Amino acid sequence: MEKVRILGIVGSPRKDGNTAKLVEEALEATRAFPWVETDLFSIAGKKINHCVGCYRCMEKHQCVVPDGLYQFLDKYIPADAVLWGVPVFHMGVPSVVKALLDRFGCMTLMHFLTQGKDVPRFSKVCGVLVSGASHYGGQDLTLSYLANSCLLMNGVVVAGDSIRGDSYIGAAAWAGQWPNPFAKDNVLKDEKGIAAAKSVAIRVAEMARIVKAGKAALGSELPAEYSYTFNLEMPAKAKLIA
């Protein structure tokens, strides 16, 4: 039985915090399936620069800035599915996540379009998870942003079992409980949020298996865009056009 690879992405600059625990709980739920293989990428401690609009990616077919983006790509590219997890910052994603998505999205387009190919149809199955210091501090906005980003990257976004009271488009957990609203394990006290994250993760695993089996069964009947792969090398140094 071919494994389904699920990548958990911890999009928090805070190491081993609530978002990391939320993503790990979600990944653990998928490990009950013998056909699932999990991996993890954490943004914490990584240097990820913002896009400066130099357009060198049009010339080189990839971003010329050698930083944590390439560590991310090493794990993202082979994954069949991804579970995005972020904390809510100012009713949105952390700036480092925005920087990652800006460059990754642009580079994906330029890598293929500048070589005369159509936009790739990766069809990665995606689930989105957020943790916030309050119940209603922008969780829905952040979930929507992540879900739309996945759609923009030709992903297949799934939700949990919303009829049971889970979040409609992902999972939102509360991590701001008193008396210590900044504790790194507060999210584990939110039983409903953890249950929602596990529900999303299970649906991601199931759908990823369906998509992978379907692509394998159809094989050459599908357009070439479904089987594109990156051919990337870490740039030696950045040469930017201001």
Task: Place the predicted regions along the sequence by residue.
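Helix-loop-strand module that forms the ligand-binding subsite of alpha/beta enzymes
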Residues: V4, K60-I169, M234-A238
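N-terminal beta1-alpha1 ligand-phosphate binding loop
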Residues: V4-P34
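Conserved beta-strand scaffold positions in the cores of enzyme catalytic domains, especially
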Residues: G8, T38-L40, V157
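Short, glycine/serine-rich, charged loops/turns that create anion-binding
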Residues: P13-R14, G45, A133-S134
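Glycine-rich phosphate/pyrophosphate-binding loop and the adjoining helix
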Residues: F33, V156-A242
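N-terminal beta-loop-helix "entrance" segment that forms/cooperates
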Residues: L40-C63
